[in-house]
């Protein structure tokens, strides 16, 4: 009788082997989850289609009971170079992590910018806090006449010819957000005409309408 009991114990051991096999299956499922992370990295590869500009990186400190805790902030502008742009602000203990957070926030703030022949439809001014940015259309070949923070936003938005001037605060955060406010305020000739109840010819130059009819708008 003791012998069969040992064989029964051996059978139980076999069942335990099956359980370990099940554990192997679970490990396989964890590997599948890893595949999900690979898909996430694939999405990260798709981000190469976007233009990312780090405008400024600052080190900040928080005073706590035990001393100071340092971290980094990053102001990032992201666009596709074809009329879509957004700005984000990230904060983390390491610079790469702060930039990554800024990029993700910028993508959540994407919006479309009206363009005609690589420039803006009309002059406009944007304000944010003490920062003021003035933008004016320019003829083809002029280039982007702008300072660092303004240039980063305009180039990410796909604007190739524009004149700009920054007034007031020289803080990069204020300047970037003032530029974003200016771009958000841009309107197409059709939108202005509809708001005023006038024909399009009465609110836009003939050359602008010809360029728009030629299919060079965005």
UniProtKB/Swiss-Prot annotation:
PROSITE patterns: RIBOSOMAL_S5, S5_DSRBD. GO terms for cellular component: small ribosomal subunit. It holds the Pfam family Ribosomal_S5_C. The keyword Transmembrane helix does not apply. It comes from Kineococcus radiotolerans (strain ATCC BAA-149 / DSM 14245 / SRS30216). This is Small ribosomal subunit protein uS5. With S4 and S12 plays an important role in translational accuracy. Residues 8-25 have a biased composition (Gly residues). GO terms for molecular function: rRNA binding; structural constituent of ribosome. Belongs to the universal ribosomal protein uS5 family.
